[in-house]
From Swiss-Prot:
Residues 74-84, 94-117 have a biased composition (Polar residues). The gene is Bcl7a. Pfam families: BCL_N. Residues 151-165 have a biased composition (Low complexity). Residues 54-72, 128-145 have a biased composition (Basic and acidic residues). This is B-cell CLL/lymphoma 7 protein family member A.
Length: 210
């Protein structure tokens, strides 16, 4: 029997506590957060204040409550005093949760919107990279082309040098040949009459002019 009586007492106490809490919540539902000056000082505090109603009696009650709050002594039960703090905590938590819920949505939207412009520009860059890769591949596939061009340049330079040396050799040889011919002609002219000498000299002059 003692166990049942204890249970009944706890149930009745719980019901009373629930009623008190519900009454405190109903009172606090109509409160607002406002900036309130503290007494005669210029300090202002942002805290919960009961909503003013048009009725005269309620206005007087609210004025009394406002004076008590300005003095720093709130005429409320511990449950009522704790309930505004709980409401503040709930509001702050709800605001933070709403911000936290909104921030991932914004991040998702930004992540969804950001890849769209990034997909378009890589097309030309891929083309240029492909061209560069093709050029490198061509250079790797045909390494002998550059070597062949270098060999051709070296051969052409060698041919030019050989031609110039041959020309230089031919000029003194031609001069020596002309000198030998003139000496031979002069030797022949010694035993030839003067008329033939004149003809030979004229022919030599013509050959030299040519």
């Amino acid at each position: 029997m003692s166990g049942r009586s204890v249970r009944a007492e706890t149930r009745s106490r719980a019901k009373d506590d629930i009623k008190r809490v519900m009454a405190a919540i109903e009172k606090v539902r109509k409160w607002e957060k406002k900036w309130v000056t503290v007494g005669d000082t210029s300090l202002r505090i942002y805290k919960w204040v009961p909503v003013t109603e048009p009725k005269v009696d309620d206005k007087n009650k609210n004025k009394k409550k406002g004076k008590d709050e300005k003095c720093g002594s709130e005429v409320t039960t511990p449950e009522n005093s704790s309930s505004p703090g709980m409401m503040d905590m709930h509001d702050d938590n709800s605001n933070q949760s709403s911000i936290a819920d909104a921030s991932p949505i914004k991040q998702e939207n930004s992540s969804n919107s950001s890849p769209a412009p990034e997909t378009n520009p890589p097309v030309p860059s891929d083309g240029t990279e492909a061209k560069a890769d093709e050029a490198q591949a061509d250079g790797k596939e045909h390494p002998g082309a550059e070597d062949a061009s270098e060999e051709q340049n070296s051969q052409s330079s060698m041919e030019n040098s050989v031609n110039s040396s041959e020309k230089a050799e031919r000029q003194p040889s031609a001069e020596s040949g002309l000198a030998a011919e003139t000496s031979a002609v002069s030797q022949d002219l010694e035993g030839v009459p003067p008329s033939k000498k004149m003809k030979l000299e004229a022919s030599q002059q013509n050959s030299e002019e040519m």
